[in-house]
Amino acid sequence: ANAKYYHDALHDALTGLANRSLLYDRLELLLERGKRHPETFAVLYLDLDGFKRVNDLFGHSVGDKLLVGVAERLKTCVRPTDTIARLGGDEFAVLLD
């Protein structure tokens, strides 16, 4: 039961992606690790243009399906060591490690 609560606290309920809190935790670990062993990493920020219009025209259920679709597509584009997070609304971040 505790593992489920822990997972739920660190993941977005809609997409299953990491949430902002987990992204920040992993970024902090990378920065700390970088002090000892300099490495290269990147943070990508993505915002879906026109997403509000999708919700307004087609409803939130369609908007939710779009967000889930974007999440699934992003998962196919990164390595297992990378972190994809939904920051909220239509904002995503990818931590390339």
Positions of predicted regions on the chain:
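Conserved long alpha-helical elements within nucleotide-processing catalytic cores of c-di-GMP signaling
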Residues: Y6-L10, G16-V43, D49-R79, A85-V94
